[in-house]
Every structure is written in C-alpha cells, then in structure tokens.
UniProtKB/Swiss-Prot annotation:
Keywords on record: 4Fe-4S, Iron, Iron-sulfur, Membrane, Metal-binding, S-adenosyl-L-methionine, Transferase, Transmembrane, Transmembrane helix, tRNA processing
Residues noted as binding [4Fe-4S] cluster in the record, renumbered to the chain: C74, C78, C81
GO biological process: tRNA methylthiolation
Recorded GO MF terms: 4 iron, 4 sulfur cluster binding; metal ion binding; N6-threonylcarbomyladenosine methylthiotransferase activity; tRNA (N(6)-L-threonylcarbamoyladenosine(37)-C(2))-methylthiotransferase
Family matches, as NCBIfam families: MiaB-like-B
Name under which the protein is recorded: Threonylcarbamoyladenosine tRNA methylthiotransferase
Pfam families with a match to the protein in the record: Radical_SAM
E.C. numbers: 2.8.4.5
Chain ranges of the Radical SAM core domain: 60-295
Cofactor(s) the protein requires to work: [4Fe-4S] cluster
Top enzyme class: transferase
Protein family (similarity comment): Belongs to the methylthiotransferase family. CDKAL1 subfamily.
Function: Catalyzes the methylthiolation of N6-threonylcarbamoyladenosine (t(6)A), leading to the formation of 2-methylthio-N6-threonylcarbamoyladenosine (ms(2)t(6)A) at position 37 in tRNAs that read codons beginning with adenine.
Length: 425
C-alpha cells in the first residue's frame, strides 16, 4: 500500500499484514515490491528525508496530457483535512526542474496539454523565496504553438496577492482561462472553524476581479456541507453564493469526519439534515447551466484530446476550457478544429465542423444501410424467381414481371446467332 492513506494511518488493522510505502519514499517502490515478493513485509514511512525526485518514471492515462505536480504538502492546517497529516508542510519543486519537465513533455514526448497540480497550486514557491507567477511566466515560454496549459486548484489566500499577474497569465493565448478556487463555505463563521484563513469577501474579490479581467473565464469551486458548526443560516449563505456566481463546475461534498483531525471531535450534524442540505444544493446546481440555448450557432476553436464515453464524439476544449463534443469522424486527436455549436447540455456543448453546411451530414455506414437492404431484397427475389420458384414475379410481383421479361429477352438475343434472327413476343 502506498500514498496518503498508508502514511497518515499506518496503524489501521487492515494495513498490518501488508508492505507500506509512505509519500516521502515513493521512489523506492520497486525495492519494496521486490522484498514483498520474497515474503518480507516492508514499512517505509520516514518523513525527514528529501522528497522523491520529480523525474520518476510515469505512465500517462492520456498520452496527450502531462500532469505535472509542482509541489507536495501545503501551508494550511484545515481542521477537517487529513492530507496534511500525510504530506506535511509545503515543499516546492525547483523552478528549473519543473520547466525542464514541461519542455521535455511538449517537445520530446509530444503532449498537447500541461496540467499543473498540487495540494495548493497558489502556495508554490513560498518556501523557496518565489511565487507562483514566477513559475507560470517561465512555463509559458516552453509551450509550443498548438498546445495549452491548465492551472489546478489554488486556495484563495495565495492568489489574493497576485490577482493582476494571474489574470495576465490566464489571458495568455496558450493558457486556458480556467481557475479552480475551492471556497468550501460562504459563511465566515464556518470558514473560521475550518481554519481556512480567508473570508467570503476575499473569495468574492478574487472571483469578481477574474470575471472582470479574464473574458469568459471558467471558475470552478468546492463546497463542504453540514460541517459540524454549520447552521441553517450558514448553509443559506453558501446557497446564496452559488446563486450569485452560478459556478459551471461545483464539487459538492457532504462533510465526513476523518479520524485524528480536530473537526472529528465535534458533534456531527444529524445525517438526515446533512443529506437534505446536500440534496438542496445539488438541486440548485442542476437548475442552471452555462450552456444555454442562446449559444447554439456560436463558433469555437477547440483542441480535441480524448474520446467521449459514448464513443461517438471527441472531447475538446476552447480557450475558456468549456467542454465541446465533436463527431469522431471529424476529429484527429491532439489537433485543433473550428466548430459550430448545434446543441447544448448541462455539462457541454455539442458541435460539428464550421465548414459543414447546416443540411450536410457526414457520410457513414448508417447512411448506406437502407440502400444495402434494398439491394439485398432485390437479389433475394431474383434468386427465388430464377432457381426456386419460376414465375414468382408474374404471380406475386406483377409490377416487376415486365422488367424481368425484358431482361430475359435481352439475354436470349445476346446469345443467338445474329445471322438467323428469331423474334420473341
């Protein structure tokens, strides 16, 4: 067992008879597997060693997307979170190493998208005398034409000091205008109990600035509902925030106590009430959409990077990281395509190439199917008349009989000696 769970809770009964690799020892995974196969139980949980090197071998789920972790750990001490117990304080990877990793992924390995990730993207560099904009400016320099970068989750406190710089980066033509800022609650009282180190006003300051300065920005956020100290009034504040911004991506989480965390010692809200609040916010989220009917007919340039679950469409994103589906027959993975929106759903827009006329449809096997069936029927009827039931046409299909008779006459003329013509009636 490797990762956060084994590091944070190694004494759990179900972990007693397995080998464990902590988050600071992940570069020794091959060694641990080898010892385990020999029948030895290994437990590597040391915290005070340097972090595993950034350039460990990896296997991409999507060969077109490089997921680059820029740091490990965080600067916060949220009362509900157990990740800090496993990953510890912030450790930022060196700027030069990250830039080289990105350069190699783009130029040597052919990826088309770079996704930056960490426990808190905005905190990068604060332990090494740098700030996130320093890294982002260097990364955009190595992004080739036709490729894009997407920023991961960043908590409000560490973006407040750099609103102008972050907006500038998000407006860069090779960076998606996408920002994931988890608010968790819109109640200042609950945020204080969570030790989130910001207020609702801080979050709104960020959101309002980005909306005003980054055209068509896509803002995603998270909510934790039924935190032990959340009142109905607190919950309503969170509902009001969702109504105000209508977040296109909203990750709704019902609070669950994590053993060993300060919040786990607090009295839980009744389960029925917790589910009621979760259902209410989920219903609110379903009641609106970014993709309205008014958007049908819009033109977009999208980068297609994967196949949709229906296996009929390619999944692409425009500059605002809006999801746009394109019929697979028109897609080439890793390339851009100009499309026109033809339909909308809650989570995406459906499109076809802008070069296709309104009444023009792609040629596919489905379009040839009726013709194939018709031809098969004719062949079958011809075979029945000729080999199984002579006179079938005359008896059952008189409207075809004359045509068939003409065909027989033509055949007889073809094989008869032309010097002694015979006429058939």
């Amino acid at each position: 067992m490797a990762g956060c769970v084994s590091q944070a809770a190694p004494s759990e009964p179900w972990l007693q008879n397995v080998s464990i690799v902590g988050v600071k020892q992940i570069d020794r995974i091959v060694e641990v597997v080898g010892e385990t196969l020999k029948g030895n139980k290994v437990r590597l949980l040391t915290r005070n060693r340097p972090d595993a090197v950034l350039s460990l071998p990896k296997m991409r789920k999507n060969e077109l997307i490089e997921v680059l972790s820029i740091s490990t750990g965080c600067l916060n001490n949220c009362t509900y979170c157990k990740t800090k117990m496993a990953r510890g304080d912030l450790v930022s990877y060196p700027l030069a190493d990250l830039v080289e990793q990105a350069r190699a992924a783009f130029h040597d390995e052919g990826v088309k998208e770079l996704w930056l990730t960490s426990e808190d993207l905005g905190a990068w560099g604060r332990d090494i005398g740098l700030v996130l904009p320093d890294l982002l400016r260097e990364l955009v320099k190595v992004i080739p034409d036709g490729s894009m970068m997407r920023l991961g989750m960043t908590n409000p406190p560490y973006i407040l000091d750099h609103l102008e710089e972050i907006a500038e980066i998000l407006n860069h033509p090779k960076v998606y205008a996408f920002l994931h800022i988890p608010v968790q609650s819109a109640s200042d009282a609950v945020l204080n109990d969570m030790k989130r180190e910001y207020s609702r006003r801080h979050f709104e300051q960020i959101a309002d600035y980005m909306i005003a300065n980054v055209p068509n920005i896509y803002i995603a956020t998270d909510m934790i509902l039924a935190f032990p100290t959340e009142t109905l009034e607190d919950f309503e504040e969170s509902m009001e925030l969702v109504r105000k911004y209508k977040f296109p991506s909203l990750f709704i989480n019902q609070y669950y106590p994590r053993s060993g965390t300060p919040a786990a010692r607090l009295k839980k809200i009744d389960t029925v009430e917790a589910r009621k609040r979760t259902a209410a916010m989920s219903e609110l989220f379903r009641s609106y959409t970014r993709y309205t009917d008014e958007r049908i007919g819009e033109l977009h340039r999208v980068l297609v990077t994967e196949v949709a679950a229906d296996k009929l469409h390619g999944v692409g994103h425009n500059k605002s990281y809006e999801q746009i589906l394109v019929p697979l027959e028109y897609c080439k993975m890793g390339e851009w395509i100009e499309v026109r929106v033809t339909a909308v759903t809650k989570f995406s827009m459906i499109s076809k190439p802008a070069s296709i006329q309104e009444d023009q449809q792609p040629l596919s096997l489905m379009h040839l199917f009726p013709l194939a069936v018709f031809c098969l029927v004719l062949i079958t009827l011809y075979s029945v008349d000729r080999f199984l039931y002579p006179g079938f046409f005359e008896e059952w299909l008189p409207f075809l009989a004359d045509a068939h008779h003409d065909e027989q006459q033509a055949e007889m003329w073809e094989h008869h000696d032309n010097s002694d013509p015979v006429f058939y009636e």
